[in-house]
Amino acid sequence: MELRHFNQVQLSRRWCISPRTLERWRWLRQGPNYLKVGGRVVYRLDDIEEYERRHV
C-alpha cells in the first residue's frame, strides 16, 4: 500500500533534507502545500509529486 500522506520527517527523508528546512519553507511560504491535521503538519502525496515535477 502506498503512502498518501507524509509527515515532516518522512518527507525530509524522501528529499534528503533536514526537517528544519521544511519548517523554514513553511514559514517562508515556500515548498509544497501542506495541511494541519490535529495540530500536525502533513503533506499529501499529490502535492509532493506536483512540487517535484515543478522543481526537479
Predicted regions and their residues:
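Short Lys/Arg-enriched helix C-cap and helix-to-coil transition segments
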Residues: N33-V41
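Residue-level recognition of specific faces of alpha-helices
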Residues: T21-R24, N33, D47
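Intrinsic disorder/low-complexity detector
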Residues: N7-V9, L35, E49
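A short, Lys/Arg-enriched interface patch at domain edges and termini
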Residues: D47-V56
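Alpha-helical DNA-recognition elements
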Residues: L28
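Polyanion-binding surface elements
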Residues: M1-R24, R54-H55
